[in-house]
């Protein structure tokens, strides 16, 4: 049976390394499902969850919060390079919820003061916090 090898790497090191039968990601161009023998390609990832169906158990799915990055698919090897990534089991949801509140306050403050760059950064922080919360709740 054909399989994929999935590796997710951040500046801190290897976050994920397993075999899979299916991987789902969201690129800047939209959702993408990847099966073995997928065409080789490179794409830019959005801040979103990565879904990995493990080869060793058809009912076992791993969820990983990825904060953007790049995905390379080459000869059934999927490599994701991201600024940060966390497996669902490693996410501290209460910490992510606090980050969400901080980001929401920062957005309001930036809008009140018409600080466009700060507002943009705060919106990205909010998106990342929401992504972590969503993935953390997948367990």
Swiss-Prot record:
Any single Gene Ontology cellular-component annotation: plasma membrane
UniProt topology in membrane: Peripheral membrane protein
Induction: Induced by a decrease in external pH from 7.5 to 5.7.
InterPro entries linked: ATP_synth_F1_dsu/esu, ATP_synth_F1_dsu/esu_N, ATP_synth_F1_esu_C, ATPsynth_dsu/esu_N
One Pfam family hit: ATP-synt_DE
TM region positions: none
GO biological process annotation, one example: proton motive force-driven ATP synthesis
Main subcellular localisation: membrane
UniProt GO molecular function: ATP binding; proton-transporting ATP synthase activity, rotational mechanism
Keyword terms of this UniProt record: ATP synthesis, Cell membrane, CF(1), Hydrogen ion transport, Ion transport, Membrane, Transport
Cell compartments where the protein resides: Cell membrane
Subunit structure: F-type ATPases have 2 components, CF(1) - the catalytic core - and CF(0) - the membrane proton channel. CF(1) has five subunits: alpha(3), beta(3), gamma(1), delta(1), epsilon(1). CF(0) has three main subunits: a, b and c.
Annotated function: Produces ATP from ADP in the presence of a proton gradient across the membrane.
Family: Belongs to the ATPase epsilon chain family.
Name used for this protein in its record: ATP synthase epsilon chain
Organism: Streptococcus pneumoniae (strain ATCC BAA-255 / R6)
